[in-house]
Amino acid sequence: KRLWGMEEFSFQKPITKNYTYEYLFHNLLGHVGLAKVKYFFINLHLNDQDLGVYAVEESFSKEIIERQNRRNGPIFSTKDELGEYFPNIAFELYSESYWKNQYPKLISDLFSILNNIKMAKFHVNDYFDMDKWAKYFAIMDLTGAYHGALIKSVKLYYNPTTALFEPIGYDFHKGAGIFGGFIIMDFLQEETKDSKTACSFICGHKEWFLRFLEKENGELNNKFIKKYIEYLIEYSDEDFVNNFLKKYDK
C-alpha cells in the first residue's frame, strides 16, 4: 500500500534538517531535471494528539525513479559505520535482496565499478553521467549545502537506459560550515592555509571531488568542468533564482 504515492517514508521534526531549506533543495533538484525524493510538511496527529508540523521524507525505492520518467534501477549508498571519507568507504544497496536475486550479474558488476572508483586509474566519465553530476555540484555551490555533495550523503542511482550513475540528493543540512566564496572547483587550486579555511568541514573530502575535476592521469576533466561552469553561470543568474522561487512563493 502507498500513502502520498510512497511505499516508505519517515517523519521528522523540521529542525532536524534545518526547516524549509531541505524542502527547497529537493525541489531545486527537480527544477533542473535531477532525480529527487519527496519532502514536504504536514500537521501530524497521533491518537487525537496534535503533534504540530512534521517533515515527511521519502525513503529510497523504485517509486522515486519511475515518478521521474526513468527506468527502475538499483540505488547505492555508503555504509557510514565503515567510513565516510573517500576513498575509505564501502557501498551498500537499497532493496538488496530483490536486486541480487533478480539481477545477480548486474549487481556484481556495479559493485565492482563502485569499488574501482576508489582507485586512482578510474575513468569516471565512462560510468558517471557528467551532465547530471555537473548540475548537482553546481546546485551545491549555489546553495552552499555542501553536506549533500559528500559521498556519504548523495545516493547513486544506476540508470539502466544510459548505463551511467546519477545523483539523488540527500541530507543537505544547510548551515553546516561557513564557506564564504568557496566553490567546488577551488579544490583544483594549490592548498594553502586560507583555502583550507574556505572549504570548512569538506576539506577532508577533497579526493571525492577530484574524481570529477581531474582525469585519472591528473589532467583536468574538461568534459565535466565545461558543463559544471555552464551550469554555475546559468544557476547563479538572477532570473533563474527568481523563476524557481516564484514556484514556491506561498
Give, region by region, the residue ranges found by the protein language model.
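Short, flexible loop/turn elements at secondary-structure junctions
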Residues: K13-K17, L46-D48, A55-S61, D80, ...
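Short, conserved helix/loop micro-motifs enriched in His/Cys and acidic residues
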Residues: K1-Y23, S108-F122
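Active-site substrate-binding loop specific to GH73 endo-beta-N-acetylglucosaminidase modules
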Residues: I75-T78, L82-F86, L156, F165-Y170, ...
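Catalytic-loop signature of eukaryotic-like protein kinases
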Residues: N43, A145-Y157
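A conserved helix-loop-beta module that forms one wall/lid of the active-site cleft
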Residues: P14-Q49
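Internal "kinase-insert"/substrate-recognition segments embedded within catalytic cores
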Residues: V32-V37, Q49-A138
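Middle-to-C-terminal accessory/interaction subdomains
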Residues: P104, S108-A149, A163-K250
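Surface-exposed patches in mature extracellular/periplasmic domains of secreted proteins
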Residues: L34-H45, H123-Y127, V154, F240-F244
